[in-house]
């Protein structure tokens, strides 16, 4: 154990303390004796010496106990209400609604899985985030509501059983940033960031660095703030009666209908898209919707339910900030930095990489079909619907509604839509993002765009667009579809854009 000059996949971006300058691995203390020291009231242990574990093994009867992170009021026949902090025993764990029994009342029923956490574990701690990537940790900590010193501990992406500490900090050159520290494991089950001081558990580690920075970039202030999760959709409610929906506020009107904010059964806030009669076959729509509801990913707008009698209703999760193309033009959208704009692009690429992996096609990828949450999370909407539209103004390339400026040449000329034509559209979407919602090919009509594309023309680099981002756009606009990159590649480049293109990493302290 100790400095052995062997690298670790995460070491090049992790902040570490007391490390070898060559290999970045913790320096082995010269004295290997099992000395016990006390520092700021905490016991300090030698990280290179085995200590007998003091924690008794967990009882198998505790494995199915959970604790409520939020209160929940029952709203369905068969679900179970509970208060924050209440303990429950899980009887059946299936899907997003788990059958449970309250240890307080003895009653049984179904509970939303995302309102509870495993008892006698780290999961109920407000600073612990399970299954969170490094990039999503940065997004969470940089979201509104968090400040200098906000922090979280997450599971390591690359090393099972290990953890990482992520802390929001301020840098004079870069502004608000997130620093990451690897939390290393002791043989006896303890933890340390610096070998100068070790802790029997993560609670003690958090307590220590909350009192003093002690070598970290800043003192830990408070756990990363998150919103109360939305309860999962009740699984049996797919084709729902129109009367269960109350339309409250019209959010917008598109070519094929209107979008409303509303409530389902007076308790669940939803978005409702009402399609104009005759815009698509109800039978074809229901078949496609059954496929669409199987596509579930954090970067895709969740499809909840449908009304299949005309006018067709599509019920989805509600996104507070509306469409990306509109949000980019608001005062809040105009203030977004290039880093945040690139992060939004990375989120969209992540969602499209999932669609790519599932051998699905969007067909109408543009900023108008990306929705934005109040925490600036982006999700892809309306995937797959374009091919169902029975409107010649949309399906014919000469039609006024056909989105020529976003469509790949092979799709315009031959009607050939593939995931690679979606990649072309993504390149156009990147121009919308970097110009805060400007219409592509400014000053050109649709026929002029078609003529220019046939001559090999490509949109010029927009103002304030980094050269490296324009290079990525040009890759998306390769003439031969097979020469265009995958969405997974686009995601990887955009997630670490300045790192990937300039090789800049956070320096080791």
Curated annotation (Swiss-Prot):
Residues 127-224 form the SH2 domain. Residues 61-121 form the SH3 domain. The keyword Disulfide bond does not apply. It is an enzyme of class 2 (transferase). The active site is at 364 (proton acceptor). A lipid is attached at residue 2 (N-myristoyl glycine). The keyword Zinc does not apply. It catalyses: L-tyrosyl-[protein] + ATP = O-phospho-L-tyrosyl-[protein] + ADP + H(+). It is found in: Cell membrane; Cytoplasm, Cytosol. GO terms for biological process: intracellular zinc ion homeostasis; positive regulation of intrinsic apoptotic signaling pathway; positive regulation of T cell activation; response to xenobiotic stimulus; T cell differentiation. Non-receptor tyrosine-protein kinase that plays an essential role in the selection and maturation of developing T-cells in the thymus and in the function of mature T-cells. Plays a key role in T-cell antigen receptor (TCR)-linked signal transduction pathways. Constitutively associated with the cytoplasmic portions of the CD4 and CD8 surface receptors. This is Tyrosine-protein kinase Lck.
């Amino acid at each position: 154990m100790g400095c052995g000059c062997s690298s670790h996949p995460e070491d090049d971006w992790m902040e570490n303390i007391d490390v070898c300058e060559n290999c970045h691995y913790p320096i082995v203390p010269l004295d290997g004796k099992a000395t016990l020291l006390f520092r700021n009231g905490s016991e300090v242990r030698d990280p290179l010496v085995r200590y007998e574990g003091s924690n008794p093994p967990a009882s198998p009867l505790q494995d199915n106990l959970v604790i409520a992170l939020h209160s929940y009021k029952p709203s369905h026949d068969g679900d179970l209400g509970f208060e924050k902090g209440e303990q429950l025993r899980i009887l059946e764990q299936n899907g997003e609604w788990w059958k449970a029994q309250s240890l307080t009342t003895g009653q049984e029923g179904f509970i939303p899985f995302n309102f509870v956490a495993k008892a006698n574990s780290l999961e109920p701690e407000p600073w612990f985030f399970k299954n969170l990537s490094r990039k999503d940790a940065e997004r969470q900590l940089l979201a509104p509501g968090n400040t200098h010193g906000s922090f979280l501990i997450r599971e390591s992406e690359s090393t099972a059983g290990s953890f990482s500490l992520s802390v929001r900090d301020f840098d004079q050159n870069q502004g608000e940033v997130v620093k990451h520290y690897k939390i290393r494991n002791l043989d006896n089950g303890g933890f340390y960031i610096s070998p100068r001081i070790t802790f029997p558990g993560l609670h003690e580690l958090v307590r220590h660095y909350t009192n003093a920075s002690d070598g970290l970039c800043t003192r830990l202030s408070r756990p990363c703030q998150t919103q109360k999760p939305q309860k999962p959709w009740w699984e049996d409610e797919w084709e729902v009666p129109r009367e269960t929906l109350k339309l409250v506020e019209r959010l917008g009107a598109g070519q094929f209908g209107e979008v409303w904010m509303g409530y389902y059964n007076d308790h669940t806030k939803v978005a409702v898209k009402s399609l104009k009669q005759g815009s698509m076959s109800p039978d074809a729509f229901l078949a496609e919707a059954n496929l669409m509801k199987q596509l579930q990913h954090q970067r895709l707008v969740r499809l909840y339910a449908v009304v299949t009698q005309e006018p067709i209703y599509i019920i989805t999760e509600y996104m507070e900030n509306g469409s990306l193309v509109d949000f980019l033009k608001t005062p809040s959208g105009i203030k977004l930095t290039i880093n945040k704009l690139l992060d939004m692009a990375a989120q969209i690429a992540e969602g499209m990489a999932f669609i790519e992996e599932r051998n699905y096609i969007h067909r109408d990828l543009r900023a108008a079909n990306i929705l934005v949450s109040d925490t600036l999370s982006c999700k892809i909407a309306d995937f797959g619907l374009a091919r169902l539209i029975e409107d010649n103004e949309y399906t014919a390339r000469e039609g006024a509604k056909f989105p020529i400026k976003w469509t790949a040449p092979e799709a315009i000329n031959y009607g050939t839509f593939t995931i690679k034509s979606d990649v072309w559209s993504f390149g156009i979407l990147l121009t919308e993002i970097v110009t805060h919602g400007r219409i592509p090919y400014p000053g050109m009509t649709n026929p002029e765009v078609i003529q220019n594309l046939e001559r090999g023309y490509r949109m010029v680099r927009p103002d304030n667009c980094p050269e490296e981002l324009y290079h990525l756009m040009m890759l998306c606009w390769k003439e031969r579809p097979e020469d265009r990159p995958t969405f997974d590649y686009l995601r990887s480049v955009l997630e670490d854009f300045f790192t990937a293109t300039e090789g800049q990493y956070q320096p080791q302290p």
